[in-house]
């Protein structure tokens, strides 16, 4: 066997996709059943991730801080019974939620560098926080649950600053 008989085949990276969802569980999301709507939307988004064999993670923020509730993993048994205990109330520590998500995305980037990482932020934007866009988020989507007569437009402001997509829940459900 000689050197010309050896062949090197470069394989395309198979990093997959991670969808990191950040759910606003603050008191303002309880009004108008926004949190219930957000939970229903999350169930649908997790079902899509599961069907696509994509990984998902869920960070919830409200009250005094944020915590990782699921993942990152391929959601297999995601259903309403798992999400029902996620309650709401208190302040809107958006920066804490984004910081927690940034840690999830950073760990994912180290573990699977070729993975495409999506950050979804489901909030009404009723926070004075102006967090910076997480460095390891390849794509960012804001889902704006603000429905007040006088809108603050903070989701739009952050989406514009981050170069992110902005949707209402109705646009994603339709």
What are these regions (language model features)?
Residues 1-20, 28-34, 51-52:
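Acidic, polar low-complexity linker/tail segments
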Residues 18-20, 116-120:
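Structural motif
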Residues 23, 60-62, 121-123, 144-146:
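Short beta-strand/turn micro-motifs composed of small residues
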Residues 25-36, 126-130:
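Short acidic, Gly/Ser-rich segments with clustered Asp/Glu that frequently serve as metal-coordination loops
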Residues 36-52, 57-58:
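An active-site-proximal "capping" alpha-helix that borders the catalytic cofactor pocket
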Residues 55-85, 130-133:
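Short beta-strand-loop
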Residues 66, 76-117, 126, 144-153:
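Von Willebrand factor
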Residues 125-170:
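VWA/integrin I-like adhesion module and closely mimicked acidic/polar interface patches used
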